[in-house]
Swiss-Prot record:
Domain of life: Bacteria
Location of the protein in the cell: Cell inner membrane
Function: NDH-1 shuttles electrons from NADH, via FMN and iron-sulfur (Fe-S) centers, to quinones in the respiratory chain. The immediate electron acceptor for the enzyme in this species is believed to be ubiquinone. Couples the redox reaction to proton translocation (for every two electrons transferred, four hydrogen ions are translocated across the cytoplasmic membrane), and thus conserves the redox energy in a proton gradient. This subunit may bind ubiquinone.
Coiled coil: none
InterPro entries with a match to the protein in the record: NADH_UbQ_OxRdtase_su1/FPO (IPR001694), NADH_UbQ_OxRdtase_su1_CS (IPR018086)
Organism in which the protein naturally occurs: Xylella fastidiosa (strain 9a5c)
Catalytic activity: a quinone + NADH + 5 H(+)(in) = a quinol + NAD(+) + 4 H(+)(out)
Main location: membrane
UniProt protein name: NADH-quinone oxidoreductase subunit H
Membrane-traversing stretches: 62-82, 94-114, 127-147, 166-186, 202-222, 239-257, 264-286, 293-313, 339-359
Gene giving rise to this polypeptide: nuoH
Similarity comment text for this entry: Belongs to the complex I subunit 1 family.
GO biological process: aerobic respiration
Amino acid sequence: MNTWFLNVVDPLHQWFLGFGDIGVVLWTVLKILMIAIPLIVSVAFYVVWERKLIGWMHVRHGPMYVGMGLFQAFADVFKLLFKEVLYPSKAHKAIFVIAPLLTLAPSFAAWAVVPFDTKLVLSNANVGLLYLLAMTSLGVYGIILAGWASNSKYAFLGAMRSAAQVVSYEIAMGFALVGVMIAAGSLNLSQIVMAQAGSSGFFDWFLIPLFPLFIVYWVSGVAETNRSPFDVVEGESEIVAGHMVEYSGSVFALFFLAEYANMILVSFLISIFFLGGWLSPIQGWVSGQVSPLIDWVWNGGWPWLLFKVLFFASAYIWFRASFPRYRYDQIMRLGWKVFIPLTIVWIAVTALMVFSGVIQKGV
């Protein structure tokens, strides 16, 4: 499915390399832009999709104007960009501005090791899984600094909640990925996907043998991104808007962009770790070459990855429309007393399944 893309990219890559070190730098910048620009556009349309889907769930229309609602998110972006950035009188202005950048940067940096198809990855790092854990953990520092620099008790309380929540669920997410690493035998994300390849279709995916870890990772991902029903960090009924309460204009838009970029990232990672990434659910059931336009249906390709991502991204919205916000003590209890013990037990079970041959890599 990606052959036509590689036929265009490979000659372009060789052309840039002809300029020496400058060409390498320009090629790297171009690859970064090829990830960053579609991600920003995806966030805009994701916001529109969220509003339309929640509107449908509430039996109302949702956005209807500004290009029939399609460009509503872009209108909101321009509105925020041209609004004045107001600084609290007692805020630490330098850290106040740096904090949203520290939150946004890891959200984009994590995409460097995310594969979209065979050979379609910015950096095919052998320690990609470890790099992802590091990047997804760094975003909380921006939130903590935002709460502290605002010099507001509501912002500081939201920041402290975020720190405790991220630390609690980061452990469970890390343990869940240890199970994936044991099953795949690699920290490379592309190799993790190929470890789920086989002639049995979706029966070869890690979703079935690692189902408890899949649930833990999915729920922990929702908690990590501070989305409903784990949105006590910015609970409107308690602390107004949490760490973002003093932010306005373009700096507020950076927090908004980071949150939705993280939601899309988690949707990609769940699809890669547990649902075979770009692999087809009927791979091995049908064979033959008909046309590049339809061969991906059984041979796999990036459209399958996007379908899976769309499902999990829509699930975020479904959770928001369906579940009430958990109490803070309930969130902590779920993370420490349920998820962490469950993941530890299932890591041992996964090791036994690999040792006994129940899980076989890439068969």
